């Protein structure tokens, strides 16, 4: 799914436009953050739950959880992350906000206690 990036003071906005029937396996987010469904209908599955969301809605998302997102129709999904250094370097931001696996997440949490 194509990703669009936007910035405000201290904030990183990441928009993903999903086509009907597409699925995304998300990275593990390192921080509490919010996501918004601006258009469409998605199913979000974790190891614990499966939930349906219909736009417009938003969720405050718990860190440390891997998610799979399925677009039941064309959807616009937006994550809002903190960006305290106001960097626009996407690779630096991704290292701060996500982990690729649970081992990496545990290492991040232990390093940033």
What is the meaning of each model-derived region?
Residues 25, 44-46, 61, 79:
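Short hydrophobic/aromatic-rich beta-strand segments that constitute the beta-sheet cores
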Residues 43, 56-58, 95-97:
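A beta-strand edge to alpha-helix "cap/lid" segment located at domain peripheries
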Residues 62-91:
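Ligand-binding loop in jelly-roll beta-barrel domains
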